[in-house]
């Protein structure tokens, strides 16, 4: 009889064990998915200083408005994001607002990240919180007045920020919409490949047309399908190969920031996602715009 009385206890213990194993497996899957999304988003390229620890920040980004330094996004509770709640993380990513309620400068690409889905945003957070915490103080930005005035960002948002999730086009294929999500939200390609106005907002009607004023003063090429000034002479295989390896059809290897984007992120993406990005890019309006260094 004692053995019979123990049977329900054993069964309950097995149920709890199986539930715990299932939860652990689900957590591991979320971490892996979050790592993939971080790769796609190019987070390591911006949030890791040369010779520094992964995602601990401190990388300088020179712009026409001054020099910005990326923050520590490891789970350190004092100098990183270790105390952030899910809601605070999503608000930062998708609204450009810190846990303290201040606006981030749009050098942080929240105008694109606003389109990221809830599930992707939380998977990114789960992955970041699985990493070792690095105690490294954030370096203050070196930005001239009036651009250094945080309150000015409120007006900037009213003029140029359109918050809201990604909305797939019902008349387009699933592949196109996946590519649109990757390009316009997660990988935020337009943040570097689109020219900006005097206030630092991307120019409407010039999406992906390139700019001579890229990060650190780099020339950022036109990636619309214009055959003369963009990638219009590239076929689908050319684009996929470039995204995977950084090699152009002319057999020259990409340099600068884009090399890091490929090495730290794009080369890890699935073939399906690389093809989706390609499908979207080649379906965009061709814009005639030669990108040359300013004299």
What does each model-identified segment do?
Residues 34, 40-50, 89, 124, ...:
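The canonical Cys-X-X-Cys-His
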Residues 1-6:
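N-terminal secretory signal peptides that target proteins for export/translocation
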Residues 10-20:
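Bacterial N-terminal signal peptides
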Residues 136-154, 293:
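Extended, well-folded interaction surfaces typified by the phenylalanyl-tRNA synthetase beta subunit core
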Residues 46-52, 94-95, 129-130, 192-198, ...:
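Detector for the c-type heme attachment site
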Residues 21-39, 78, 155-184:
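Electrostatic cytochrome c docking/interface patches
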Residues 87, 96, 101-105, 109-112, ...:
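Membrane-embedded segments
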Residues 62-91, 111-121, 207-250, 260-274:
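Electron-transfer interface patches adjacent to heme c in soluble/periplasmic c-type cytochromes
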């Amino acid at each position: 009889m004692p053995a019979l009385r123990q049977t329900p206890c054993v069964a309950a213990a097995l149920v709890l064990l199986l539930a715990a194993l299932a939860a652990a497996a689900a957590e591991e899957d979320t971490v892996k998915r979050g790592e993939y999304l971080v790769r796609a988003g190019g987070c390591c390229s911006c949030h890791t200083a040369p010779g520094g620890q992964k995602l601990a920040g401190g990388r300088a980004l020179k712009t026409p408005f001054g020099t910005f330094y990326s923050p520590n996004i490891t789970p350190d509770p004092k100098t990183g994001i270790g105390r952030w709640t899910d809601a605070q993380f999503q608000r930062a990513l998708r609204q450009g607002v810190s846990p303290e309620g201040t606006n981030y400068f749009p050098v942080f690409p929240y105008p694109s990240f606003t389109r990221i889905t809830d599930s992707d945003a939380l998977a990114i957070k789960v992955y970041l919180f699985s990493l070792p915490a690095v105690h490294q103080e954030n370096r203050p930005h070196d930005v001239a007045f009036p651009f250094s005035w945080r309150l000015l960002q409120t007006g900037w948002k009213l003029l140029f920020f359109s918050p809201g999730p990604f909305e797939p086009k019902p008349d387009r294929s699933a592949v196109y919409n996946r590519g649109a999500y990757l390009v316009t939200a997660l990988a935020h390609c337009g943040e570097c490949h689109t020219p900006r106005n005097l206030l630092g907002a991307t120019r409407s009607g010039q999406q992906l047309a390139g700019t001579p004023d890229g990060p650190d003063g780099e020339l950022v090429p036109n990636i619309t399908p214009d055959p003369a000034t963009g990638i219009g002479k590239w076929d689908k295989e050319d684009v996929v190969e470039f995204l995977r390896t950084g090699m152009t059809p002319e057999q020259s290897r990409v340099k600068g920031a884009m090399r890091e984007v490929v090495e730290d992120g794009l080369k890890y993406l699935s073939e399906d996602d690389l093809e989706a990005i390609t499908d979207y890019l080649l379906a965009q309006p061709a814009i005639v715009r030669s990108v040359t260094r300013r004299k």
